[in-house]
Amino acid sequence: MKQLLDFLPLIVFFVVYKLHDIFWATAALIVATALAVIYSWYKYRKVEKMTLVTFVLVAVFGGLTIYFHNAEFIKWKVTIIYALFAGALLIGQWVMKKPLIQSMLGKEITLPAHAWSRLNIAWALFFIFCGLLNIYVAFWLPEAVWMNFKVFGIPGLTLVFTLLSGVYIYRHMPQEEK
């Protein structure tokens, strides 16, 4: 249910874009994301940090997009979110000396320290790749291509990378947990 709640504002963004334009779609995205945060708080009595960061960036960059009537702001939001995620993973790994992925999943999954580190770095690199790919698609290809990429391409890439991560985790789990 939570994944659907996170994905719903993106679907609203896409549908409104197809019916109107990117500015109407951006306004709808802001409203849909705010409603998703409110619903999450009402239903679960908590909002994930990642969801809150995403909402703040949607509100700020979406607001700038509408105010200046310039779609570049909302296009940059994707890259900035991925840069923040990658930065958080790398800071956790190198400064705090503990992979953030391990902090998030370590209660459910047991892996050797080197596997956590590699998985953490792999996700950081994935986020960097997605951020750079977004820059290319957003600023070198037509807006409609970027919209399809944002709604279908990035989630598709994330799904594939999540499945590959699952295979990696399975291969490094202790035998008794498999």
Curated annotation (Swiss-Prot):
UniProt keyword Transmembrane helix, yes or no: yes
GO CC, one annotated term: plasma membrane
Principal localisation: membrane
Source domain of life: Bacteria
Sorted UniProt keywords: Cell inner membrane, Cell membrane, Membrane, Transmembrane, Transmembrane helix
Subcellular compartments: Cell inner membrane
Transmembrane segments: 22-42, 50-70, 76-96, 121-141, 149-169
UniProt membrane topology term: Multi-pass membrane protein
Pfam families listed in its UniProt record: IspA (PF04279)
Purpose of the protein: Plays a role in cell envelope biogenesis, maintenance of cell envelope integrity and membrane homeostasis.
Membership in a protein family: Belongs to the YciB family.
NCBIfam families in alphabetical order: ispZ, PRK00259.1-2, PRK00259.1-3, PRK00259.1-4
The protein's name in its UniProt record: Inner membrane-spanning protein YciB
Organism of derivation: Cronobacter sakazakii (strain ATCC BAA-894)
Gene name tied to this protein: yciB
